[in-house]
A protein has these predicted regions:
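Mid-domain alpha/beta scaffold segments of enzyme catalytic cores
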Residues: 1-267
Length: 267
């Protein structure tokens, strides 16, 4: 689809919380413009996600700059080799920051070999322990690691009182059912609009609307009809419409329920 053929971005008739994006890829006027444009289409709050040792402070600074932006702290599984006792102490301190809502993006990713499984598991478990200490939810990334994800979550879900979300869910229905049974939310994004993502759409159809969170994972995974350009929170209306259609509810109902889900999970 050419740029000229792309439809305008709808303005949502309801509030929405962007539960997962990476605003640290933007700065200056581009960051300000993205935030303003997102508000114009109905995005009320934005959660920007930490992934590496280097960007912990950056996302906190972005959150501090705006009353409706919040953040997380944690190491992505690709960055698991950075996990150490010293980083753990830093994370404990940062978790108490008033704009830090959750520990994440943490988890397991065996699709890429950025860190070996044992290193990833150690970082995952260590960061979950800090979430338990601070009564924070977790933002989990899992890819090609279903059994180890189940094993880790089975051992901690009782202690993890606020649970959290399996973000950008693309795994099996079996893992979805397990995570739901353990009390976690599932996060869905532009992948749901992709032609070859029928597996994700099937999980959405079978996930109770009360357990769904909406996200973009910007600047990645831009939804159709804007696929091919950098993603941003202001594309959430296309994701909301797709999920509403799959759940056979109005966009207004979806927004009402997922807004409350987001509050319950993070705030």
């Amino acid at each position: 689809m050419s740029k000229k053929a792309r439809p305008p971005i709808p303005t949502l008739d309801g509030k929405i919380i962007e539960t997962h994006c990476h605003l640290d890829y933007l700065s200056g006027d581009e960051l300000a413009g993205t935030i303003n444009k997102s508000r114009d289409v109905g995005v009320e709050k934005i959660i920007t996600i930490a992934v590496s040792e280097e960007n912990q402070a950056v996302v906190r600074e972005i959150a501090e700059s705006d009353p409706n932006i919040w953040c997380t702290q944690g190491l992505h599984p690709h960055e698991a080799a950075s996990w150490s006792a010293a980083f753990g102490q830093e994370l404990r301190s940062n978790a108490a920051h008033p704009k830090v809502l959750a520990i994440g993006e943490i988890g397991l990713d065996y699709y890429y070999e950025h860190a070996d499984p044992n290193t990833q598991i150690a970082a995952f478990e260590g960061q979950i322990a800090i979430a338990v200490e601070h009564n924070k939810p977790v933002v989990i990334h899992t890819r090609e690691a279903e059994e180890d994800t189940k094993t880790v979550l089975s051992s901690v879900s009782t202690a993890l009182s606020k649970k959290g979300v399996i973000h950008s869910f693309t795994s099996s229905l079996d893992l979805a059912e397990f995570c739901l049974s353990e009390g976690f939310y599932l996060g869905f994004n532009g992948i749901a609009t992709f032609k070859n993502a029928e597996n994700v759409r099937e999980v959405i159809r079978k996930t109770p609307i009360e357990r769904i969170l909406l996200e973009t994972d910007a600047p990645y995974l831009t939804p159709v009809p804007y696929r091919g350009v950098p993603n941003a929170p202001f594309y959430l209306p296309f994701i909301a419409q797709t999920v509403a259609d799959l759940k056979q509810v109005s966009v207004e109902e979806l927004l009402s329920v997922t807004y409350q889900n987001s509050l319950d999970c993070f705030f």
